[in-house]
Amino acid sequence: VASLEAFLRGRLCTAGATAAALTAAAHTLAACARRPWPLLDAEADARTASPAQRDAARTQGRLLLRVARRVWPSPVLDELAGAVPSPHHPLALGAAAHAAGATSEEAALAAAYHAVAGPATAAVRLLGLDPVDVHGVLAGLAPDLAAAARTPHPADWAALPAGAAPALDLLAEAHARAQTRMFVS
């Protein structure tokens, strides 16, 4: 469990911080009169080195956007779907959070949590770790998750974080080509 905690902390500082910032940017963009969704989506592309990770993020974003449009009908969500039919997950999450009435910080917190909860769940399933121990690790990350959500997010999208984990990118590419696939993300 100690190595899982170290992994999750590293993930939160890289992919989690990037996803939180992109989600907050999407939430902010959703409140604007002019919404250049394709430009923000390109920023997400630029921060996701692995094509397999980009495909997974777009699949998750498309599916989330589909559900969000039914649960929280909104012109903003319709506009995002028209501009970017398969947006990166953080864009869909930020826009959906806006449509649901959540704050930018709440949206960023959801993105940060998503970045660590998925791998934590996979560790329980694939490594046979005790779920109570793993959830204890997640609970211990709460202050760091809150800090990631509170981090000021620059208005200049080029200045958004771009934390990377090259080893995970390589694993994602190998997994995408594997005959037996366990997860998409």
Which residue ranges define each predicted feature?
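Amphipathic alpha-helical segments within well-ordered protein domains
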Residues: 5-9, 24, 65, 94, ...
